[in-house]
Amino acid sequence: MGKIIGIDLGTTNSCVAVLDGDKPRVIENAEGERTTASVVAYTDGETLVGQPAKRQAVTNPTNTLFAIKRLIGRRFEDEEVQRDIEIMPYKIVKADNGDAWVEAQGQKMAAPQVSAEILKKMKKTAEDFLGEEVTGAVITVPAYFNDAQRQATKDAGRIAGLEVKRIINEPTAAALAYGLDKSGGDRTIAVYDLGGGTFDISIIEIDEVEGEKTFEVLATNGDTHLGGEDFDTRLINYLVDEFNKEQGINLKNDPLAMQRVKEAAEKAKIELSSTSQTDVNLPYVTADATGPKHMNVKVTRAKLESLVEDLVQRSLEPLKVALADADLSVNDITDVILVGGQTRMPMVQAKVAEFFGKEARRDVNPDEAVAMGAAVQGGVLAGDVKDVLLLDVTPLSLGIETMGGVMTKLVEKNTTIPTKANQVFSTAEDNQSAVTIHVLQGERKQASFNKSLGQFNLEGIQAAPRGMPQIEVTFDLDADGILHVSAKDKQTGKEQKITIQASGGLSDEDIEKMVQEAEANKEADKKFEELAAARNQADQMIHGTRKQVEEAGEALPAEEKEKIEAAISELETARKGDDKEAIDAKVQALMTAAQKLMEIAQQQAQAQQAQGADADAQQSKEDDVVDAEFEEVKDDKK
């Protein structure tokens, strides 16, 4: 079996790791970075991912897609999506199935399709390091992701050409990375994971028995729409408001200016983790009739903290719920681990330390721990790691809608997965021939307040008074946290099964089409690379030939020189086009035309070599004379 890589598909940054021996190792990307910006940009004929995409965002804001993870598995009408529409420079549109999609270069795309571009970059990074093709991956998701979001993440993996061996929760992965090489008995850890777009808290127990470690998640909670991007937005709004007060210009209507402000806000936020004050200077941020305008705003750490205090406070509520669900108090927590880039903010660290009554561990890299844990799980699945057992949980309760619009739970939240549960239901009316099974996820009693995961019908029920037929509903929750549901009429034996796919989501046909598009793009990318290489070769050939013509001087006959110049001119014309074969042919033609020039260059080189040899011989003679004189002087002295 080939290597199974671990991928942390993050909102702001992504990271890939692999098990190297018995230790997880983070792999650097082509730019030499250990993390890759989760940014995808679409330009004319090219798709950029990571830093190259981020660099051109200011000049291409509407086609540069970031924080796509906030949209994955979401419906267009979701409150969180509607909030994002207000602040994102790119277009968020409604798909035919009601999902939140994006639009770039006039093309509508599903969130998993865009995320697949980031996963492809991670896959290529691992393949370059390992020197072999990679097909298997463990991908992490926020613990509080629902079924639709998990399914959409798996879809992204498929579109990227990966077989997703397991979906695991980010805090659990971080605990794996942290606890793998720790000894010293049992411990209960709290993983506080505040990333770019999501927040999770997991309480995890690590037991060690005869060298085998069991990582058991006791409880998990969180907020899938709280993260560093929200902190950035608060600072962006403050900077824009200050500029408006000073200049009377609202930058929110200018996408280019807003992209510059976004980058400056992100930079200022990071700087304020290590300094108490910073300046945001953006010369020529915009202009009006009176001339260019510059932004110059001083931001103190205290100001930033006042802007985001309620967001940090919002992250503390799930901590209380998770502890209560695990039936523990803060005193039972052995270690606190911080994961996610936003946990570098001193205020976050202070509030978490205050809540738990202890400082968080400093020996965990918040940007890399999740990918490393995913690589460990990859090693477990590949059979390379034998002494680790991971027991994860489902973050939300699962059930069906029953009479009166009530949600009846079959699987309670924080149940260890995989798990199976069944319950017998009956009909609500006399002679009812079909029932609709409406599957829900959430904690509210009223069905309409929970997340609808999908519905299906069981038909052909024999006519009988209400309450008589026995319909057995079975929930089968797999290790990825994805639900399979079946309903069976116990009298007739008729059964209906589905893998839950929300009324939205991508169908197998959609995914297959996107896989084919990705393959076609792969072919297009390959052609683009080959064309770029041909153009580079043409440039080198033109430059090298012109240099040799100059060096040959009068030794090159005039008619030969004309032939070469004509061939160079034809190659320059071909180089401007998109036909690789034409460029290759003209390179060949120039090589043929420059044959005489090559001969002259060779003769000149040989002549220089001969001159060099003569000079060496002459030098050698002189050296001999000096030695001889030296010898004679010694003889005289005798």
UniProtKB/Swiss-Prot annotation:
Keywords: ATP-binding, Chaperone, Nucleotide-binding, Phosphoprotein, Stress response. Induction: By stress conditions e.g. heat shock. Pfam families: HSP70. Residues 603-618 have a biased composition (Low complexity). It comes from the Bacteria. Signal peptide: none annotated. Residues 624-638 have a biased composition (Acidic residues). The modification Phosphothreonine is found at T198. GO terms for molecular function: ATP binding; ATP-dependent protein folding chaperone; unfolded protein binding. Residues 603-638 are annotated as: Disordered. PANTHER family: HEAT SHOCK PROTEIN 70KDA. Acts as a chaperone. Belongs to the heat shock protein 70 family. This is Chaperone protein DnaK.
